[in-house]
Amino acid sequence: MLNFKKLSIIIPVYNEQDSLIELIKRTVNTCSKLKIKYEIIIIDDGSNDKSINILEKEALKQNSKIVAIFLKKNYGQHSAIMAGFKHSSGDLVITMDADLQNPPEEIPKLILNAEKGYDVIGTFRQNRKDNWFRKISSRLINIIIQIVIGKSMKDYGCMLRAYNRNIINSILEYNKKNIFIPILANTLSKNIIEIPVLHYEREFGCSKYNLIKLIKLIYDLFFCISFNLIKKNKMFNIFIILIFLAVLMSIVFFFIFFLKIKLNIFYKILFIPIIITLFLIKSFIIIILKILIDIFFVKAKKNSIYYINKIIKNNFSKKKDVT
């Protein structure tokens, strides 16, 4: 049984003024009942609502457990999480969303499993309360990951996850934009478990998840998997990914564009193999170039994936212009 000295909670925030006060209240209340030191690191990812003001006020309170990190602009959830990882000091780190769909009251459940010796504690949402678009897109991504990397987990998209410090330190060594943290973490350890957690309908604000973010997520997922597969000389697996994506893109392209063109159905169908071939060629060239750039340039120069405006910690505000 492991005993952790300190817990770090990482919460990325973007325009969550409606849920932020309730989020902080419930998270602090949950953590204060634990027999462990803790910090709650909330990263504002360039919000343009009142989230910044709320965070500043909460972090500047006497004996506040809130560490507020303010990024210079909206870099995306991944970069915000990486900023939180870098400035965390706990030997156990838990990530969670700010929308309260996964309740903070589930945190002790993750700690209990981490104490059993698991390096990574994933979660899957029971009776998921999202709309059909999020459910289908999440299911699609989970299927792609399971087929390609062979790690059978039910829900790679749930943000409520726990990592021990060794895993966090290894993740920070990558320092790239196009990595998918759950996949990377799972490749760094075989000592992994996935547990069920509660999931509620979104009560505050609206979801930031849309088609554009789904495409970006698939892009990051694609390059993250491919980078690891190329290092392991598994080119066939990459080819399978390309075929899968090509077929998927062809179907989408067919429904969006071809159905609007007045052509015989036979000629419309003929376009599909052409699209697949072109997509495969282009994707293969792009991925090889991308990975070569990563290998020869990113390793030589650690490019920043985010810039911090300021940090408020221990009731003290500090301006900061670096990562």
From Swiss-Prot:
Family stated for the protein in its record: Belongs to the glycosyltransferase 2 family.
Membrane topology, from the record: Multi-pass membrane protein
Tagged with keyword NAD: no
Alphabetical list of Pfam families matching this protein: Glycos_transf_2 (PF00535)
Acyltransferase among keywords: no
Organism of derivation: Wigglesworthia glossinidia brevipalpis
SUPFAM superfamilies given in the database record: Nucleotide-diphospho-sugar transferases (SSF53448)
Pathway where it operates: Glycolipid biosynthesis; 4-amino-4-deoxy-alpha-L-arabinose undecaprenyl phosphate biosynthesis; 4-amino-4-deoxy-alpha-L-arabinose undecaprenyl phosphate from UDP-4-deoxy-4-formamido-beta-L-arabinose and undecaprenyl phosphate: step 1/2; Bacterial outer membrane biogenesis; lipopolysaccharide biosynthesis
Function: Catalyzes the transfer of 4-deoxy-4-formamido-L-arabinose from UDP to undecaprenyl phosphate. The modified arabinose is attached to lipid A and is required for resistance to polymyxin and cationic antimicrobial peptides.
Protein name listed in UniProt: Undecaprenyl-phosphate 4-deoxy-4-formamido-L-arabinose transferase
Reactions mediated catalytically: UDP-4-deoxy-4-formamido-beta-L-arabinose + di-trans,octa-cis-undecaprenyl phosphate = 4-deoxy-4-formamido-alpha-L-arabinopyranosyl di-trans,octa-cis-undecaprenyl phosphate + UDP
Main subcellular location of this protein, as a coarse class: membrane
Superkingdom classification of source: Bacteria
The EC number(s) this enzyme carries: 2.4.2.53
GO CC entries: plasma membrane
One Gene Ontology term from the biological process aspect of the record: response to antibiotic
MF terms (GO), sorted A to Z: phosphotransferase activity, for other substituted phosphate groups; undecaprenyl-phosphate 4-deoxy-4-formamido-L-arabinose transferase activity
Top-level EC class as recorded in UniProt: transferase
